[in-house]
Every structure is written in structure tokens, then in C-alpha cells.
Amino acid sequence: MSFPSRTRFFDPGSSAGGGEVTLVSMAPNGEVSGLRTALAMGAAKAILVSDPALAGTDALGTAKVLAAAIRRAEPDLILAATESSDGYTGTTPVQIAELLGLPSVTFAKKVEVTGSSVKVERQTEAGYDEVECPLPAVVTVTAGVVEPRYPSFKGIMAAKSKPVENLTVADLGIDAGQVGAAGARQEITDVAPAEARAAGEIVVDEGEGHLRVIEFLEQLKVL
């Protein structure tokens, strides 16, 4: 999740006009350290879904759980990272939008709320698109959407008393058979380290180095 972008965007003292940030996370073993860090950055409260029944949940199952938790918060705008650092599917935010019946905009490099709509500069291979959609909406942001912010000592102390609502699958009204390994439509069959890359070749140019470069490019069928 992109905690800094959310807390910076809705900082009451910022030009964005203020607001309140509610964090929503799904994590094993009641893990709250990441949420506490984000609370220290300025978020008001958090919702944590943690349940042994979630072990083995795939992207769609994760989306179902997070959508149910987000629905409780009744947000005007849902911000998420483009993809997580574990599964890297990049599909969960748009699945959440579909489950909630909301429009979604991905790869946002700039986000601006204007009245009842949100304007987004969406990053593309050729540059960016300007997109506008009504609120509420789901927007996924890229790493450079804001400058990173860090929790202050005052924020760290304040975070200790901010509320974190702990929920289970049953609390969300979700059948345990729809999530976890039992409900997963994807299965990880193997996890293996990437093959080690061979050391590159250093070409010492004594007047004919370009010939070796041409030979190398021909081997790659570039020429």
C-alpha cells in the first residue's frame, strides 16, 4: 500500500483541502507494525483483517476481503499502490473497484480532487493521459506521486492511541470457503530463485573493439 501518498494527499494542512485517512490492510498474525507506521504519518484510524482462514488467499480472494472492509469505511476516494511487493499481480485494486461497483483509474502520477470528481494524470508508455471520473472511485498510484514523508516523534507517540479495528472473515460476513486456499482460483506450485546472471564481457578497445561489439549484436540477432 502507498501510505505516504494517502497521508500527504489528505494532510489537513496541505493544499489538497484536508480530509481523513482510514487505512485498510489484510495481514497474517495480527501484524500491525506497518499500520502503526502509517498512523504515525498522519492517518486517523485503521482497519486490519487478520484470520487463519485467509492463508493461501489469491488476488480475487484478497479483493473480496478488502472490498468488504473498505465498504465499512464508506470512503470518498480509495487509493492503493499499483501492485503489492509480494504477489505483484497488479489486479487487486481493479478487482476491488469491480466488487464495489466503482470506477477505477490505474498508474496515477498525479491526483487532484475537484468537487465530486477526481482528475488523474495516468502514466503511459508514451507519456500520460488526463482522466477524470466521478467519486467515489479507486485510484492506483505510482511510486513518484508524492515525495516520501517520514513519521515524526510526535506522530509516533500519537499513533499508539489511534484506533485499529481488528476484523475476521466472519465479521465481514464472508464465507470462509470463498477465501484462503479453499476459495483460491490460483495456486502457487513452485517458488524458485532467479537464475544467476553470467558476468558480462569487458571489451578492451585497442582499435578494433567495435568489431567485437558488432559480433556480439549479430549473435543477439539485433543486426
Where are these regions (language model features)?
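N-terminal glycine-rich FAD/FM-binding segment characteristic of electron-transfer flavoproteins
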Residues: 1-223
